[in-house]
A protein has these predicted regions:
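Leucine-rich tandem repeat or coiled-coil scaffolds
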Residues: 1-369
Length: 369
């Protein structure tokens, strides 16, 4: 059984005395604890120092969640506290590490890059919304490149403004490891040059199962993604939403998707696929792949009549087929209004018929009798 030590969230830890009960629990269960969760707290420097001493005693620790730990802390405090907490993980077989939602930026990279250089057992690394920027991303990637034995399966580095420089650095990591199964790097302002490098590096990771690269500039580099997709035989999930790929590449993308045996989920929202004929081709390609379970095409101004034509078949064969977001409400309202108008017409026809019958009856009455 996996023993999880979970510290209550939304607490501001400044007084070391407040840690006594927590430290006692850690010490008593040091041989049982496998996972340690400290997320959604606010840790001061002295508390981080004392807590790190207790964490270092845990014998079989493999999973660590340090997400969202420094709310309201000064930027001078954060690197010191983080370094204490990361030092406690050295010489352990850590396979999962989450440092997301800590806005430390490049200034705090030296507080944990030493761990990345030495963590040979690390498989899952989550660094979301850390304010890394291009420089911070490069520093993280350089540390990973110095670790010859690391074989990451998961990298989540979303919302970090990697831009081209950060993407080029990350591509070197992906190309070297060849072990990745899950990649998330959405909302990073990456240019086409950076995305081309990422796609070519992804090609080296034959076991990749999930790719989420939405909200980056991939319109001018998506052909490289389309070219490598047939080689990613384990791929199950792909999200290229908010990338403005347009009709031409939208069709080419789904044409390739239609031939992938393992693909199950495709997200292609808000991509300016607005041509009715192009949408029809895409719907046909979706139907050709019997393994797909979920398709999202929201925000592409899907033609209403076309949607009605394919809706029944899609919903019978897919777990989810979603083409409308805010437009969906308008679509449903139009349907309701059309229904109301039809009802009004039927009521009017019924009343007209009743009026005609009444008039006939009146005409048949002999007023002279």
């Amino acid at each position: 059984m996996k023993y999880v030590c979970k510290i209550p969230g939304k607490v501001k830890w400044d007084d070391v005395k407040d840690l006594e009960k927590m430290i006692s629990e850690i010490t008593e269960n040091k041989s049982k604890i496998k996972s340690f969760e400290l997320t959604h707290n606010s840790i001061g420097v002295e508390c981080a120092k004392e807590l790190s001493k207790a964490i270092s005693l845990i014998e079989n620790l493999s999973s660590v969640n340090y997400r969202d730990l420094f709310v309201s802390r000064l930027k001078e405090e954060l690197p010191i506290s983080l370094k204490y907490l990361m030092e406690s993980l050295m010489n352990k077989n850590i396979s999962f590490l989450d440092l997301s939602d800590n806005a430390f930026g490049p200034i705090a990279i030296p507080s944990f890059d030493f761990f990345l250089r030495e963590a040979t057992s690390l498989e899952h690394l989550e660094l979301e919304n850390n304010g890394l920027g291009p420089e911070g991303a490069e520093m993280v990637c350089n540390a990973l490149l110095q670790n010859d034995k690391i074989n990451l399966k998961t990298i989540k580095i979303n919302r970090n403004r990697l831009e081209e420089k950060g993407a080029l650095s990350l591509s070197k990591v992906l190309e070297k490891m060849k072990s990745l199964e899950n990649l998330e790097m959405f909302q990073n302002g990456i240019s086409s040059t950076g995305m081309k490098a990422i796609f070519l590096a992804i090609k080296e990771n034959k076991n990749i199962k999930s790719i989420k690269i939405n909200d980056n500039c991939i319109k001018d580099s998506i052909q490289y993604l389309i070219e490598i997709l047939p080689e990613l035989t384990q791929l199950k999930i792909i999200d290229i939403s908010d990338s403005l790929i347009g009709n031409k590449f939208g069709i080419e993308f789904f044409k390739t998707i239609s031939k992938l045996d393992n693909i199950e989920e495709v997200y292609c929202n808000y991509n300016e696929i607005e041509d009715k004929n192009g949408q029809k081709e895409i719907f046909e390609y979706i139907q050709k792949n019997k393994n797909i379970k979920i398709v999202e095409l929201k925000g592409n101004e899907i033609n209403k009549d076309l949607y009605k034509k394919y809706e029944k078949n899609m919903k019978e064969n897919l777990d989810k087929f979603d083409c409308y977001s805010e437009n969906e409400d308008e679509f449903e309202e139009e349907e309701k209004e059309e229904g109301k108008e039809e009802d009004k017409e039927e009521d009017k026809e019924k009343k007209d018929k009743e009026a005609d019958k009444l008039a006939d009856c009146i005409n048949k009455i002999d007023l002279n009798k």
